[in-house]
């Protein structure tokens, strides 16, 4: 997809009503500081449109980024941030669950996992939660540039094992710095949001990203 127009159309807080959007949506979930905003900026080809921060827990709303007046990239609040009160965490959880269950336009959920570490209990809980809400999430193993090339296969296997992924479940190693994995991500997103006649996803590339 060629990015011609980007706009933060909708911001949903814990007291807000979920919108009925006119375009298909793909959502991004992950623990605080996993690189979610950086990934979304890379997808939008913008340096800092989605606000990034070294402070975990910065995203506290559901943010809908309008792409070309044809789809939304949806940024969900990060989880696992220790300095947030249990009451606030519970509110965020209900907000995310409500979105996953009620959005009629949501086509797929991408779950971000830091490739340097085994999935945490919170990661596994979020994965199970997404599955229980009717989606088989695509896993994005972020911060690929932070490990050596020789470590990639081992760490990908650790993420797959830690989440209990099936052979056919898709995992994409990704770096917001080098943009490795960006093309594969967009090919997948296009396959979910574009009409079939417009979707020219290369089947060979699709096979590669499932390795």
From Swiss-Prot:
NCBIfam families: GTPase_YsxC. Signal peptide: none annotated. This is Probable GTP-binding protein EngB. Its cofactor is Mg(2+). Residues 22-195 form the EngB-type G domain. It holds the Pfam family MMR_HSR1. The keyword Magnesium applies. Necessary for normal cell division and for the maintenance of normal septation. GO terms for molecular function: GTP binding; metal ion binding. Keywords: Cell cycle, Cell division, GTP-binding, Magnesium, Metal-binding, Nucleotide-binding, Septation. GO terms for cellular component: cytosol. Belongs to the TRAFAC class TrmE-Era-EngA-EngB-Septin-like GTPase superfamily. EngB GTPase family. One of its GO terms (biological process) is division septum assembly. The keyword Cell cycle applies. It comes from the Bacteria. InterPro entries: G_ENGB_dom, GTP-bd, GTP-bd_ribosome_bio_YsxC, P-loop_NTPase. Mg(2+) binds at residues 37, 59. GTP binds at residues 30-37, 57-61, 75-78, 142-145, 174-176.
């Amino acid at each position: 997809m060629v990015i011609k127009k980007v706009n933060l159309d909708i911001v949903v807080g814990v007291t807000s009503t979920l919108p009925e959007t006119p375009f298909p949506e793909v959502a991004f979930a992950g623990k605080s500081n996993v690189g979610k905003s950086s990934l979304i900026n890379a997808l939008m080809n913008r340096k800092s449109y989605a606000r990034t921060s070294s402070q975990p827990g910065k995203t506290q709303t559901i943010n809908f980024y309008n792409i070309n007046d044809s789809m939304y990239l949806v940024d969900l609040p990060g989880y696992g941030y220790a300095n947030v009160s249990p009451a606030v965490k519970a509110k965020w959880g209900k907000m995310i669950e409500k979105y996953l269950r009620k959005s009629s336009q949501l086509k797929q959920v991408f779950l971000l996992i830091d490739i340097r570490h085994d999935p945490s209990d919170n990661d596994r809980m979020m994965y199970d939660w997404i599955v229980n809400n009717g989606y088989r999430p695509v896993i994005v193993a972020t911060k690929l540039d932070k490990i050596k090339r020789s470590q990639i296969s081992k760490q990908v296997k650790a993420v797959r094992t830690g989440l209990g992924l099936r052979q056919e479940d898709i995992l994409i190693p990704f770096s917001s710095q080098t943009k490795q994995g960006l093309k594969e991500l967009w090919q997948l997103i296009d396959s979910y949001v574009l009409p079939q006649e417009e979707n020219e996803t290369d089947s060979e590339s699709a096979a590669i990203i499932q390795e």
